[in-house]
Structures are given as C-alpha cells and as structure tokens.
C-alpha cells in the first residue's frame, strides 16, 4: 500500500544496531519517532549506555542527554537514509525539543535550529508540541526549511490550524502527530461497553479530515499513541483501524510486530462525517465532549514529557 506508511515508535541503542535494521531491510517500516519518555526508558534501563555515561561524568545533565540522544538519532538517520534518498517523503527520524522550553517560543526555536544544524541530516524532523507557543515555533521552523513533526495533537480544531500553517509555509516534509489511544483510556471508564474503544479512532479520523482539508503534498497525518491500553483489544487494533490513504502510523514494537503477522492488504475507508457526529452526540449523553477531553489530554501530555525528561536528567 503505497499510500500508507508504517513507522516505528521506539529508540534504543541495541535495537538500532539490530532489529531496527532488520525491519528496514525487509520493508516493514520506513521511518521512526522518538520522544522524551522513550529516551528516558531506553537510557535509564538499557545497559548499552552505561559505559558512555561513565565517560561523560562531570558534564551537565542536559549535555550528557544530548550526547547520547544525538548519537542514537544519527544512527537511525543513517539507517533510514537510503529510504529518504529513494523517496524524500520517507526515511525520517524525529527528535523532540526540550519539553521544559514548551512555553517559550523564542528559546524553542533557537534550540530546534541548533539541534537541526548539529545533526546536519535532511531526514531528521524536529518534534514540536501543539501548544499555543508550539504553533508559533512550527511556523518559524517551516519558514526556515526545517522538517517538523507537530506532536501531542488531540484536537481536530488544532490539527486543522496547524495544517493551514503548513499548507502556506512548509517547504520541507511535515507530519502532524495525532494521538489516539489516550482518548479511549480516558473515556472508556465513563461510557457503556458499546461506546468503548471507539473515541480515539473517531477523534483521530476527524483530525485526519481536518488535516487533509488544508494540507499540501508535503504534509501527512501521523497517527501516534497507537499501542493499546486495554488487554481486550488486539495489539494492532489502532494500526488496522486507521490504515488510511496519505497517512502514517508510528507504532510501538508490540503493535508493530502484531500487525506485521497479518497486515492490511488495502487502505481502510474512514468513517463518514455524519457517523462521527452521531457518535459525538452519543458521548454528550454521557456528558463527554471530545474537544474538552482533547485539551485535558494535551495538558497531561506536556506534563508527562516534562516528568520523563526530568527523571532522565536526574539519573545522570
């Protein structure tokens, strides 16, 4: 399916040197993403960083982090570069800016430009959260011809606004990362069984429509947070349900491996807007508004990434 791409939402030194290469070589994935939580998990729990951390002792915590993270990003970039050279729409790895700069547009822009210049790779995307100041950062980076991954997108309204900016200004590849499963984790305990495990897909589909309404050929919807939060769902539930044209799904390894055992042979047809509106009306019967939920989840996501980054820095 040329219209649909699968990326890997995982980064860790041993993985990059082994299974990551296997996934690329067999055509299973054509890109990857990272975030502060993934780096925290990898660096604090994997033995493959210990020697390098020991050699960096005495340096500032953020300097240690950047030394380790940028090495991983460069390694992923090199592995993906043949895909990028074949098709500049594929072969990207994403690196997120310091979560603690989230509410300071000027400092975020400076850091993003510094990181992109340091890495000096055309297939690196800078990840920017979809906060109020983050949208300003996205505009500045796209004008500077830096590929961007706009992350923590929960609201269709915000997705549309970002797509409009990218449609006017994007000169390089861009993706809008729509988070999915966190909606179901939030809403499912509040609704009857017949409405469960649907809110994330419904909301993501509405975001997809908003993005496609405005986006240019350089911009795609990237479905993120596609690992299941419930044991009752198939591990690849969100990949299969959101296998749409001109979209990407970045998935954790468990979901990715499950999907590869029985992949879709063709793209899914998204729900109609009338079906989306009907579902939202049903949610309102239970006093649930998806836009309000989106705002809550964005705030929680920003806090979670800060907490992960702080935990990682304090580990040094």
Curated annotation (Swiss-Prot):
Active site, UniProt feature: 127
Catalytic activity, reaction form: D-sedoheptulose 7-phosphate + D-glyceraldehyde 3-phosphate = D-erythrose 4-phosphate + beta-D-fructose 6-phosphate
Record key words, sorted: Cytoplasm, Pentose shunt, Schiff base, Transferase
CDD domains given in the database record: Transaldolase_like
Pathway(s) per entry: Carbohydrate degradation; pentose phosphate pathway; D-glyceraldehyde 3-phosphate and beta-D-fructose 6-phosphate from D-ribose 5-phosphate and D-xylulose 5-phosphate (non-oxidative stage): step 2/3
GO cellular component: a single term: cytoplasm
GO molecular function: transaldolase activity
GO biological process: carbohydrate metabolic process; pentose-phosphate shunt
Xref: Pfam families: TAL_FSA (PF00923)
Localization in the cell: Cytoplasm
Gene3D superfamilies xref list: Aldolase class I (3.20.20.70)
EC code: 2.2.1.2
Protein family according to the UniProt entry: Belongs to the transaldolase family. Type 2 subfamily.
Role: Transaldolase is important for the balance of metabolites in the pentose-phosphate pathway.
The protein's name: Transaldolase
Organism (species): Helicobacter pylori (strain ATCC 700392 / 26695)
């Amino acid at each position: 399916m040329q219209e649909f791409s699968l990326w890997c939402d995982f980064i860790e030194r041993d993985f990059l040197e082994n299974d990551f290469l296997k996934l690329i070589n067999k055509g299973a994935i054509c890109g990857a993403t990272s975030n502060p939580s993934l780096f925290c998990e990898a660096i604090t729990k994997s033995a493959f960083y210990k020697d390098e951390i020991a050699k960096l002792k005495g340096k500032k915590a953020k300097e240690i982090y950047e030394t380790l993270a940028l090495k991983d990003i460069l390694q992923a970039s090199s592995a993906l570069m043949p895909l990028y050279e074949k098709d500049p729409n594929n072969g990207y790895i994403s690196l997120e800016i310091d979560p603690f700069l989230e509410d300071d547009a000027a400092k975020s822009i400076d850091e993003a430009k510094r990181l992109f210049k340091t890495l000096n790779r055309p297939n690196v995307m800078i990840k920017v959260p979809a906060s109020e100041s983050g949208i300003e950062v996205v505009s500045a980076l796209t004008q500077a011809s830096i590929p961007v991954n706009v992350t923590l997108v929960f609201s269709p309204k915000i997705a549309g606004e970002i797509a409009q900016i990218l449609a006017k200004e994007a000169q390089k590849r861009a993706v809008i990362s729509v988070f999915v499963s966190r909606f179901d984790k939030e809403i499912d305990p509040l609704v009857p069984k017949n409405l469960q495990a649907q809110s994330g897909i419904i909301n993501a589909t509405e975001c997809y429509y908003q993005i496609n309404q405005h986006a240019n050929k350089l911009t795609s919807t990237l479905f993120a947070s596609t690992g299941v939060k419930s044991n009752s769902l198939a591990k690849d539930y969100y990949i299969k349900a959101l296998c749409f044209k001109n979209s990407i799904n970045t998935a954790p390894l468990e979901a990715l491996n499950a999907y590869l055992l029985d992949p879709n042979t063709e793209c899914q047809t998204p729900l109609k807007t009338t079906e989306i509106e009907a579902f939202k009306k049903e949610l309102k019967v239970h006093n649930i508004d998806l836009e309000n939920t989106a705002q809550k989840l964005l705030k929680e996501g920003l806090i979670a990434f800060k907490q992960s980054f702080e935990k990682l820095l304090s580990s040094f």
